[in-house]
Amino acid sequence: MEAVAELSAPSLAGAPGEYTWIVAVAGVTCFLTAFAIGANDVANTFSSSVGSRAIPLWAAIGMSAVLETVGATLLGGAVTDSIRSKIIDFEVFRETPSILMTGMLCALVGAGLWLFLANHLGLPVSTTHSIIGALLGFGLASGNVRAVKWTQVAFIVGSWVAAPLAASAAGATIFVCMRRLILRSRQPLRRAKRFLWIFIYLITLTFSVFLVFKNFFELNVSCDQMVAGGRVEHFEPCRISRWADAHSGTALGIAVALSVALTFVISCLVYRFAFYRVESYRRRQKRSSRTEPRDASEEGTGPSHARPGGLLLTPRSCVAKEGERRPGALEDALRLAGEENARIASAESRLQKPPPLECMDTCADSLQINDGRAAAAKPDVGTAAQSPESRFAADPVGSSVPDRSVLAFSRSLAEDAQAAFHASVQHCASPRCSAASRGDSRYPLQRSTSDFSAFLSSPSSSVPPSSPSPSSTPSSPSASPRRPPSRPPVPRTCSPAPVSPSVPRAFASTATHGHPPALSDTDADTPEGPDRRRQSAALAGAKDAEASPLFADLAPHPERRDEVPAAKRERDARRTLLLPPRVTGEAPEGFFAPTVSHDDNGLVFVSQADLADSLGSGVDEEEDAPRSWRGKLKAAWRSMPWFKDIHAEGSTEDDLVARLQTGAEVFDTETELFFSACQVVSACMGCIAHSANDTANAIGPFAAILTVYQSGSADSEIGSPWYILLFGGLSMSLGLALLGYRVIKTVGVKLVKITPARGFSMELGAAWTVLIFSAIGIPLSTTHCAVGSTVGVGLMEPKHPRRETGDGPVAEGEEPKKRAVQCPVINTASVNWKLFGGVFVSWIITIAFSALVTAALFSFAAYSPRMVS
């Protein structure tokens, strides 16, 4: 107990050097704790903005770094009384200031450890509850049970349920009203402009109230304030927050007036910024329509239709339109099942009864093969995406997605390969073609399905070069519907064979491992050399497609196969479904910009390495690994965490996340762009307001240690110099930049589907929940409110959203089906409940973990025996 006696000295003024190590260690620990707070709690502020693609991740980090630093430096004076008023009564440690210093150091360590663990797991936890739990463990371990404010502990336990429920109700109410009044109206953008000043006023009012009632700047006036115990204290000079408490009516009027002034200024700025985005989107739409002309049936008639290859699908709505058929989800499923069964039966019949003999087009208009890589021409892909015979169908909610049926896709590829086989057996080889038509036994025509694989694998399947048949005549350019009119006519022996639109897709899926045989010098000198090379490549692709119709092996490039050991090739080989992607380079700034998209408007997220292998990009090793110092520096910069594509990562980590991201109701694109500007303003003001409280959680214990060390007593007021506040703000900004993407991905991508309109409702609901409960006097966690509001908005998704364009007009003489619109109040399938359950459990563990770690560290530091010289 000798150590306890030494730590129980009534004052530190006599020997401050003995406790200098506590101040030094506390400074380092304060930096790490602030780093973890920035990566967790500050990330919640911009999670909905990044999740909705209103701003990219790097822009959110840059904005938060500036706003957090400014807010912590100017408004971070709240650390003065934050620790004193939360959970610990400092008056108990008036006679033992050294114990207070040791306990605060242990509290920083305990809270920091839990926050780093939560950041690693991507769990959004309350940093306020972390530091409160650490202080609770310190108070209990010190033996001063009366130092703990148990009323605050009871409020915290109740807030685990009250905060998410209240924020969910607020966010859901705002979103439902916004959806009914604006998003589902006939002219949503015009209505959004009319409601703009109301939205901005609701944002600025919460910020103004915080600025007036939580401001710790001092005024040269006197004020009286009632403190704990019923005593009234006189303060001169008086802080703005204390003056506001003493003159609540006047302070509220000032807050309203300040909010009106901010609304006028910010509304003008937001209006210009929002319509800059809208006009940019319209210009891109015009350029896209000029560069990629489509049929009139494929083009959208309104601004809500997405550009080709974009992420936005056709908007869906629960509002039925007159004269349009609105089948339900069950009817849609039955209709799609019937179409699928009919298509499979037709494919089987064609396999058993092949079509008449025809020859493949020598120009290979629908298939382009070069150096072992196959790709489909753009008109073919567009036709495949829009044709009724394509392999794409509508899901139960109406979005156009690829058919994932393994059986259907396998049979489709087998059908395409069979069609290619029947076309290729007569390809420009007149002896074989004519002999097969005459029934010559030397050239047997293998028609049966069982002999199809044998034909492809046999050496005789290759077509020998031969001179053109005398009966062949040059064909006109109009003979092939896919050939551009400007191309010259090319002679062929027979009429072009009809090739299914998915034949290029089948061949492209096997191009990485179905490398066509090299062209010999003899073949290259003959006129049929190029034609034979194209046909051999097609047969090689069909062979691999028949052997493995659904999956393609991502093996190393054939030219570099010898450089890779066989064991490594076998270990690194993976099976994946390859579809011909198209990288979209133009998109609104940080808004709905997919990583890789398809012409059928579906999405697939592929890493750069897999994409390079699947497309056979042929990038040299010098480009992959830059040798110059500038190239290495640029590559290192692009690999930083703030350039991560969290949407792609979240969708590939969990299939449920991908379903949530594609199954939500889609609103007008321009209206969403308009709300993205409002969402950025809301996130910025929330970042400034939260920076003061977040700084208090990290700087508060360190400020207490520094004040006790400088004054030598624990009863003095805790100071907070500006340089300490600046230090805390910079530390939080660095933590957000390096580790904040984990929590942003959890809340903004993996929990529910977030768009700008939804994200704005979430932020507004969370802000008003904190404001109302703070006015009542009930402490809440901003993290709990943010997550609760996110879940509440997600629950408002309709179960079966339908396309806004409907299924077409009702046929003449047919009565439209009268069916009630089904818009359920709550849709539990639109929330990732497994993830939310883990987040809720982490909220409960927060206080327990921090308290146990802090109590263990303090017990070891204060009560462990030590050697005395």
From Swiss-Prot:
Entry annotated with the keyword Heme: no
Listed Low complexity bias regions: 457-481, 492-509
Role of this protein: Sodium-phosphate symporter which preferentially transports the monovalent form of phosphate with a stoichiometry of two sodium ions per phosphate ion. Plays a role in stabilizing the cytosolic pH and osmoregulation. May be required for optimal virulence of parasites in vivo.
Family annotation (Pfam families): PHO4
Induction, per UniProt: No significant changes in expression observed in phosphate-starved parasites.
Domain of life of the native organism: Eukaryota
Transmembrane stretches, start-end: 19-39, 55-75, 98-118, 121-141, 155-175, 197-217, 251-271, 721-741, 760-780, 838-858
Region (Disordered): 286-312, 374-401, 453-571
Lineage: Eukaryota, Sar, Alveolata, Apicomplexa, Conoidasida
Mutant lacking the gene: phenotype: Reduced uptake of inorganic phosphate by the mutant parasites. Reduced polyphosphate synthesis. Accumulation of acidocalcisomes, organelles for calcium and phosphate storage. Aberrant morphology, reduced cell volume and abnormally dilated vacuolar compartment. Mild alkalinization of the cytosol. Changes in expression of multiple genes involved in various metabolic pathways, including enzymes that cleave or transfer phosphate groups from phosphometabolites and transporters that localize to vacuolar compartment or acidocalcisomes. Delayed replication. Reduced virulence in mice.
Keyword field contains Transmembrane: yes
Reaction equation(s) it catalyzes: 2 Na(+)(out) + phosphate(out) = 2 Na(+)(in) + phosphate(in)
Source organism (scientific name): Toxoplasma gondii (strain ATCC 50861 / VEG)
Family: Belongs to the inorganic phosphate transporter (PiT) (TC 2.A.20) family.
Recorded topology in the membrane: Multi-pass membrane protein
Protein name, entry field: Sodium-dependent phosphate transporter
Biased composition regions of type Basic and acidic residues, renumbered to the chain: 556-571
Side of membrane Extracellular, spans: 1-18, 76-97, 142-154, 218-250, 742-759, 859-869
Assigned keywords, A-Z: Cell membrane, Cytoplasmic vesicle, Membrane, Phosphate transport, Symport, Transmembrane, Transmembrane helix, Transport, Vacuole
Feature: compositional bias, Pro residues: 482-491
Compartments reported by the entry: Cell membrane; Vacuole membrane; Cytoplasmic vesicle membrane
Record GO cellular component, one term: cytoplasmic vesicle membrane
InterPro entries: Phos_transporter (IPR001204)
Cytoplasmic-facing ranges: 40-54, 119-120, 176-196, 272-720, 781-837
GO biological process: phosphate ion transmembrane transport
